[in-house]
Amino acid sequence: IAAFMVMLTPWNESKLLIDPMCGSGTIAIEAAMIGANIMPGINRNFQGEELSFISKDDWIQARKEAIEKENQKEFKIYAYDIDPEMVKLAKSNAELAGVDHLIDFMKSDARKFHSTNEYGFIITNPPYGERMGEKEAVYELYKDLGRVFRRIPTWSVYIISSLENVEELFEKK
């Protein structure tokens, strides 16, 4: 879903991208892989490699061609989370994916986000409460985020959420 979400936007590696509630880092990692043109699973082995009618040389050549198409340009994606343990996990996941050099992870509260950049992209999956008591806190978070996003009106903001009436919570018309 994260890769699809990034691909649905006009973002590319030359544009600023921030995930202010990165959790385990999935959106930032997928965006880094898309920006660097890294094929999914490029570093994995597949059962298909054992098929007798496809030579090992063909697999090696296909992998080599995919790696040669990777984008070597340097760019940065910024990913924040309020929970330092999630930041640590996200960094570890980015290392495993081989894109840790493309993402700056930091502990930060999304409700305090601000930027002097005229334009950028926010792509995020905010938390949502399922238990009683959490719902009100989540609604308040979404309202706070709506205020934050209204301060950056020239930015493109993409949110994925299972909450109904997200636009109302963000007080977006």
Question: What label would you give each PLM region?
Answer:
Residues 2-114, 131, 137:
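Conserved S-adenosyl-L-methionine
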Residues 127-129:
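Specific lipid-exposed transmembrane alpha-helices and their immediate membrane-water interface residues
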Residues 74-76, 80, 84-88, 132-173:
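Conserved Class I SAM-dependent methyltransferase catalytic core
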